[in-house]
Amino acid sequence: MLCRFLRPALIEIVDARLQDPRKIVDTVADNGAAAGIVIGGRPVGPMEVDLRWVGGLMMRNSEIEETGVAAGVLGHPALGVAWLANKLGSHDVALEPGHIVLAGSFTRVVFAQKGDTLHADFGSLGGIAVQFI
């Protein structure tokens, strides 16, 4: 089994050093603008819930900024993870136990500044908050 459990509540912290217009070479040079992740929520077995129907709210300072449903990620978040596993396999590389794989965001980026609190709420699957100090 590729996945023992999921953590549905996650906030990806983006720190793009390059501004528009961005080309793919800019994204690669900027390490995909990845600065970190905050993971929370309760662990969920991959067969416990139909992931396509997982909805989420992204709030900044208690105001809803973005909403979405996981089916917005290629129709099902597992499809991108399966593609990645297959692509890595074609290069004799494998996903290993303990690897964290982000399946894709189903909301747009919500910008934060010093003092802001972001809260991602996935209903019964949990939530996570982060304060920027």
What is the predicted function of each stretch?
Residues 1-75, 117, 127-133:
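Catalytic-core "active-site belt" of small-molecule-metabolizing enzymes
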Residues 63-65, 82-84, 92-93, 126-128:
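Glycine-rich loops and low-complexity Gly/Arg-rich segments
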Residues 80-110:
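A conserved acidic, glycine/proline-rich C-terminal tail/linker
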Residues 102-133:
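Conserved catalytic-core subdomain
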